[in-house]
Amino acid sequence: RKGSEISGIVVGEIKSVENHPDSKKLHLLKIDAGEDELIDVVCGAPNVRVGLKTAFAKVGAKIGEITITPRALAGFTSNGMCCSEAEIGISDDNSGIMEITDDVKNGTDLKDIYEIDDIVFEVDNKSLTNRPDLWGHYGIAREFAALAGRELKPFDLDDLKAYDGLKKIDMKIEDTLCQRYSCLQIENINRNVSPVNMRIRLFYCGMRAINYLADLTNYLMLEMGQPMHAFDSRKVEKIRIKRFDKPFTFKTLDGVERNIDENTLMICNGNTPVAIAGIMGGLDSEIVDDTTTLTLESATFNAVSVRKSTVRLAHRTDASMRYEKCLDPEMTVTAIARFVYLLKKYDSDIKVVSSLTDEYAFRYDTVVLDFDKNFVDRYTGIETVSYTHLRAHET
């Protein structure tokens, strides 16, 4: 159960800021927490400023096992505490106090505006390891729907066909270790920080927030089980998926120089590597603060190839763990449509500037399952209820 250890934290607005007379780091604040009088608080956060709305723990508030009380700090009494997201326990961000949008009323309980109270189910994946569809929350929801006879809610998706008249991205699969590669280019991206509830959900699932675009790809990987990668479009113009004849070194997003051999599949900008397929992107093409145009990748790669590459590189990632399980290639385009929908929801000024560029190296044959009720009845020795079982299979 998440969030149950937190109470009494409200929206507080900083009305005045004075430097502490004896400390370069501390500030003397007056906080409007929706009460009749302003509250005196001592705070050392670097981002304090007049007008900022933040998470304010009033006297009597509880954060874990700590109860907030009036406290003397460097000669002044602090009647509460301005909190970072890390101190509240909703992310690992302790760079400064939490920043809340101006439209929220002072004194509002944080739990009334954010999904802090939540229940997290931990599923042991030992029983799911050979079910790639269960490596995302939606797959688990599908199982629950089938078992309980409930309707599975569909994804909200963007209509990618609306962009069919736009230019295609210059992309080519040159190695069949990539089964399917789908990509889309989006520009006019203005938002850098993810919505609070998205950051909370990521944190509760064990992932840290990075920036909006990276967070959104991670969010959808957890939701759908389909890894994606966002490139800075300034660094990626001609996408080629291939291997190289000679070994070389490649610096990944974590800043590590890795030795790439001729068996490792790479995503390239022309002949320049920009990502290790199915494992991790490159540092030179990462999304940065001034990125306004991205090229979004959603693909499926040969599971054995990804597994062997992770062993050679001694580097296993959340993405590679999923690619190692033979992901469904039919999910790549759905994931892009979901990404664009959510991106538009929180950054409405974005503009899709390419059509969906989608290539198969090869396709699996379509499999149709026939349900023979009489055979199942004879085989199991019981009479099955057709409607119940068929609905479960359809789900």
Residue ranges and their predicted role:
Residues 1-161, 295, 312-313, 318, ...:
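Phosphate-backbone binding interfaces of nucleic-acid-interacting proteins
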Residues 118-127, 179-187, 318-326, 362-380:
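Short, hydrophobic beta-strand segments
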